[in-house]
């Protein structure tokens, strides 16, 4: 499974989310590959996954089918809960 992190360099909420997301993924020791997707540079991926706002984080299975997503900033507690049943 993969974690698709849609962001933009100019997006302050994206900048705030990134280290917290990395920390939670590392703590959980999940078998997930994180892929950072710069929304401005990869519009095709944004269209494919219907990303309308950033930050957006999408978990996809090995066939690139969406499992779950969230949009906006999350606290560390929220992220732990989000990844708890993956």
Q: Predicted regions span which residues?
A:
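Conserved redox-active cysteine motifs that mediate thiol-disulfide chemistry
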Residues: 6-20
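Conserved strand-loop elements at the edges of beta-sheets that form or border functional pockets
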Residues: 37-39, 53, 72
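Structural micro-motif
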Residues: 49-58
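Class I S-adenosyl-L-methionine
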Residues: 15, 22-26, 80
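Extreme N-terminal starter segment of soluble prokaryotic enzymes
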Residues: 1-3
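Non-catalytic, surface beta->alpha helical segment in thiol-disulfide oxidoreductase systems
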Residues: 59-86
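Thiol-based oxidoreductase modules, predominantly thioredoxin-like and allied folds used
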Residues: 6, 21, 25, 29-43
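A hydrophobic alpha-helix adjacent to the NAD(P)-binding/active-site core of NAD(P)-dependent oxidoreductases
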Residues: 46
């Amino acid at each position: 499974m993969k974690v698709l992190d849609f962001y933009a360099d100019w997006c302050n909420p994206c900048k705030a989310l990134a280290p917290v997301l990395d920390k939670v993924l590392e703590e959980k020791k999940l078998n997930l590959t994180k892929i950072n997707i710069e929304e401005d540079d990869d519009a095709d991926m944004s269209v494919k996954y219907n990303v309308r706002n950033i930050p957006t984080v999408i978990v996809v299975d090995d066939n690139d089918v969406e499992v779950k997503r969230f949009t906006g900033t999350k606290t560390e507690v929220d992220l732990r809960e989000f990844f708890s049943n993956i």
